Amino acid sequence: MTIIVSVFLCGYRGKTVDFSITSQHHRTTVAYFLNHGKWNDSALQKALKSSIVELIYQEARSSGQPIFCIVDDTIASHNKPPSQALHPIEAAYFHQSHLKGRQDYGHQVVSVMLSCNGITLNYAVILYDKTKSKIKIVQDIATELPEAPVISYFLCDSWYTSAGIMKSFLEKGFYTIGALKTNRILYPMGIRQKASELALRMRKSDPNVSLVTVDKGDFTFTVTKEISIRFQMQLFF
């Protein structure tokens, strides 16, 4: 904890020399621990996840409020690519940045939050090193979560609204709320059509359509209750 505090005291720019501010040990002792200390990462992560699940699921049982599993990914950019860096950073790659609209060099992580009744906790931060797809990473998260004690929801962007992920979360009691890419194929009333074509025929007066305003300027998104339930198992690439 003293290490974490010393890092944040300097505004995310903490160095080993700052350990002396919050620790009674000499900075070289702390540095030695960071460089050579041994601990079981998987056991630590398992214990942390277990405590978070216990707290969030207990809150859901006592309050009756839904659990939200929130997934997103981000890139920690680095200024110099490996061809220019004197000491290339381990596990850094070029990733497609939707924010910048181009390839960005750095570390990409998938973050998973669990939230219920105003309590939001970080369940997992997984480094995306391209040995496993982001779709598979999130599917594994869905598989390891216990079944939700109440009706709950998985929140994501259009990258994660795939049939496999939605099915995995549905098996654990989580319905998906997420954006759809316009080229997704849906089957309303058993009729095959693109999401873009279906959207053109939606009307505000339709009893199955609920307008949801998202903080994106003048943009509004429509949510069709019938479709979201019907197509949990029928969404295809």
PLM feature spans:
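Domain-level cores of phosphate- or acyl-group-handling catalytic modules
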Residues: 130-197
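Gly/serine-rich nucleotide phosphate-binding loop at the start of the catalytic core
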Residues: 1-44, 48-49
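Short, conserved catalytic/metal-binding motifs centered on acidic residues
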Residues: 16-20, 65-79, 112, 154-161, ...
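Short, structured patches in soluble enzyme cores that scaffold and shape functional sites
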Residues: 114-116, 125-127, 158, 178-182, ...
